[in-house]
């Protein structure tokens, strides 16, 4: 039986580079354990696809993982800086046993992380991650490869081109982006080559920002965590669309031609309504998380569509989609999962679907990207030290008070961050003053608990 996961969080392993768990030693150990776990058959060669984003520490962790996989007897296919969804796609395409992405997504360059994908291109389950952790705690020396069985490392030189073609295949074949001026912000991250190229090949005039990575500037004032940069660039250049990706390009936000931001909820609603009109939305159901706006749920219901919510994290969205057979899901933060085209969140493919709606309907972004009127929503993060306040009776009482105040008109969501000592407090309701009252009170209670 697998032990409780301690290394793996809600999206792989993540932490400060060169500090546990993001050390050379742990990365090498992970490579050995994951390699041995996925080498089920001994009568053929086994392989892993290994990609990364543009962080300086990516070189260090990449080399450590390579050493671990090779010592386990697994061949390594290196693809260099590519989006996370590209690693998932290539793992399936190359019939590899495993895919690995070295990235901390939207975090600053000082952090890094490791995400694992199975041979089907989906993120590993909690159970499999737990079993790999079990292996990491064991003495593996007797199970490592003999000198003749050590793995080989090679580089896939056309990996970027393969992903570009895969992304373009999601765009209707009869359409082009001629006449559209598009600002693309790649967060100085892993999509800095592939995203502008894909848009240009489809006919767009492309203006690039956040496409000059130096190892230290990923997500630094650019990308989906700093959408104000994109919005300003759209206004400056008189562009028709703006697209902001995060460091590993698994999430996307849009700016319309006026430089107004469009979040993930609006993108989900737009795609859902368009797909329903064209009989492409499976089960008339969309999967989102507890953070998605109640306004989206109401608008979907008015269009005859059901919204199902999961815990925060695109992996949980994907799991629910697979359970019920849905083909559209995502998060307010910009993770968009379109399972007709990808097994995980893919910012570029999601952006192409929005562009396709605009081209097909001949309507500007400002018209198509306002699917619903959002309820006033407020999110605050409260940092703590020591024991998490989530199990405190005082916090339970505060939540009960908030639920009573919001009854019938709104909701409160409390969530512990999976990567930082933070409690996220989110409330929404049609009464904005009530939202602020509830969030401020609950945050005050958390602070009091943290300093008690």
Curated annotation (Swiss-Prot):
The keyword Coiled coil does not apply. Pfam families: PGM_PMM_I, PGM_PMM_II, PGM_PMM_III, PGM_PMM_IV. The gene is glmM. This is Phosphoglucosamine mutase. Its cofactor is Mg(2+). The keyword Magnesium applies. Keywords: Isomerase, Magnesium, Metal-binding, Phosphoprotein. Catalyzes the conversion of glucosamine-6-phosphate to glucosamine-1-phosphate. It comes from the Bacteria.
């Amino acid at each position: 039986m697998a032990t409780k996961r301690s290394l793996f969080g809600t999206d792989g392993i993540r932490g400060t580079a060169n500090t546990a768990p993001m050390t050379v030693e742990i990365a090498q150990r992970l490579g050995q354990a994951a390699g041995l776990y996925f080498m089920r058959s001994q009568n053929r060669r086994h392989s892993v696809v290994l990609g990364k984003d543009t962080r300086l520490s990516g070189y260090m962790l990449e080399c450590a993982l390579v050493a671990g996989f090779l010592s386990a007897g697994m061949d390594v296919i290196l693809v260099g800086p590519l989006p996370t969804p590209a690693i998932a796609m290539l793992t399936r395409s190359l019939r590899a046993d495993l895919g690995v992405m070295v990235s901390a997504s939207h975090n600053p360059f000082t952090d890094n992380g490791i995400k694992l994908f199975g041979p089907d291109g989906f993120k590993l389950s909690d159970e499999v991650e737990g079993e790999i952790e079990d292996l990491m705690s064991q003495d593996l020396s007797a199970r490592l490869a003999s000198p003749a069985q050590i793995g080989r490392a090679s580089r896939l030189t056309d990996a970027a081109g393969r992903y570009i073609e895969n992304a373009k295949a999601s765009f209707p074949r009869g359409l082009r982006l001629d006449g559209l001026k598009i600002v693309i912000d790649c967060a100085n991250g892993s999509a800095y080559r592939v995203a502008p190229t894909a848009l240009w090949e489809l006919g767009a005039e492309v203006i690039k920002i956040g496409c000059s990575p130096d190892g230290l500037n990923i997500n630094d004032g650019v990308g989906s965590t700093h959408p104000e940069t994109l919005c300003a660039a759209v206004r400056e250049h008189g562009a028709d669309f703006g697209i902001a990706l995060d460091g590993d390009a698994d999430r996307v936000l849009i700016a319309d031609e006026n430089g107004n931001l469009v979040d993930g909820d609006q993108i989900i609603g737009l795609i859902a309504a368009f797909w329903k009109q064209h009989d492409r939305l499976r089960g008339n159901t969309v999967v989102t998380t507890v953070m998605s706006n109640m306004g989206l749920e109401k608008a979907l219901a008015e269009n005859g569509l059901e919204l199902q919510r999961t815990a925060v994290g695109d992996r949980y969205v994907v799991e629910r989609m697979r359970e019920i057979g849905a083909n559209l899901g995502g998060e307010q933060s910009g993770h968009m999962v379109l399972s007709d085209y990808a097994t995980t969140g893919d910012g570029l493919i999601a952006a192409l679907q929005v562009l396709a709606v605009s081209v097909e309907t001949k309507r500007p972004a400002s018209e198509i990207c306002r699917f619903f009127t959002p309820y006033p929503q407020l999110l605050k993060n409260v940092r703590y030290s020591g024991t998490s306040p989530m199990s405190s009776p005082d916090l339970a009482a505060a939540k009960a008070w908030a639920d009573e105040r919001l009854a019938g008109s709104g909701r409160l969501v409390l969530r512990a961050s999976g990567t930082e000592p933070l409690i996220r407090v989110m409330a929404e309701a049609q009464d904005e003053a009530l939202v602020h009252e509830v969030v401020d009170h609950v945050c005050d209670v958390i602070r009091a608990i943290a300093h008690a």
